[in-house]
């Protein structure tokens, strides 16, 4: 009687295919990613991610909603500020963005203001009791961050802000300006 392996040689390669592949002995690390500046690395990760973005830090919130070094009266204010501050959502232009012309400490007082409905009707916002100068940036053309063109509109009004709890300072802080309601 002859053994089966010699009589039928083709099952041997099939049996070898059924063996489990060897397990890798280490974790995969992309060392090139860790050579980048941490802020650049976080920006790339957020830009390429498919899930929700991480909440901005207090420093980033202050940068996004308060005036920069450039004067308000510049006709191209929104285009330059929104590009230099990199204000976008995963590379896409915001249709509208407000920037307050007061220090952030003054804007924090808006979280103690009157509760009003936000523009989108979903959230509960707070309206400041103090008139402030601000800029409304309205998207004119473009969809991607590199080709956004904004119209700059100077305003004086009551900022309508959404507020979030800050664990460090233990107070509510404004995180987004939804509107600037005009005085009556």
UniProtKB/Swiss-Prot annotation:
Lineage, highest ranks first: Eukaryota, Metazoa, Chordata, Craniata, Vertebrata
Signal peptide: 1-25
Positions annotated as glycosylated: 147, 179
Disulfide pattern: 93-148, 111-163, 118-125
UniProt-recorded name of the protein: Inactive ribonuclease-like protein 9
Family matches, as PANTHER family: INACTIVE RIBONUCLEASE-LIKE PROTEIN 9, RIBONUCLEASE
Compartments in which it is found: Secreted
Record family assignment: Belongs to the pancreatic ribonuclease family.
Organism, as annotated: Mus musculus
Any one GO cellular component localisation term in the record: extracellular region
Keywords of this entry: Disulfide bond, Glycoprotein, Secreted, Signal
SUPFAM superfamilies: RNase A-like
CDD domains in the cross-refs: RNase_A (cd00163)
Function: Does not exhibit any ribonuclease activity.
Gene Ontology biological process: positive regulation of flagellated sperm motility involved in capacitation
GO function terms (MF aspect): nucleic acid binding
Pfam families cross-referenced by the UniProt entry: RnaseA
């Amino acid at each position: 009687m002859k053994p089966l392996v010699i009589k039928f040689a083709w099952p041997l390669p099939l049996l070898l295919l059924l063996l489990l592949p060897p397990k890798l002995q280490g974790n995969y690390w992309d060392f090139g990613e860790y050579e980048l500046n941490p802020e650049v690395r976080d920006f790339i990760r957020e830009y390429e991610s498919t899930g929700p973005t991480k909440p901005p830090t207090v420093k980033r919130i202050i940068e996004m909603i308060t005036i920069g070094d450039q004067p308000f009266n510049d006709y191209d204010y929104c285009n330059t500020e929104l590009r230099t501050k990199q204000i976008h959502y995963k590379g896409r232009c915001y249709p509208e963005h407000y920037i307050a012309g007061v220090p952030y400490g003054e804007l924090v007082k808006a979280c103690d203001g009157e509760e009003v409905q936000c523009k989108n009707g979903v959230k509960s916002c707070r309206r400041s009791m103090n008139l402030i100068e601000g800029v409304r940036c309205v998207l004119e053309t473009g969809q991607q961050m590199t080709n956004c063109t904004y119209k700059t509109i100077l305003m004086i009004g009551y900022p309508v802000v959404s507020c979030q709890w800050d664990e460090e300072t233990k107070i509510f802080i404004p995180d987004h300006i939804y509107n600037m309601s005009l005085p009556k």
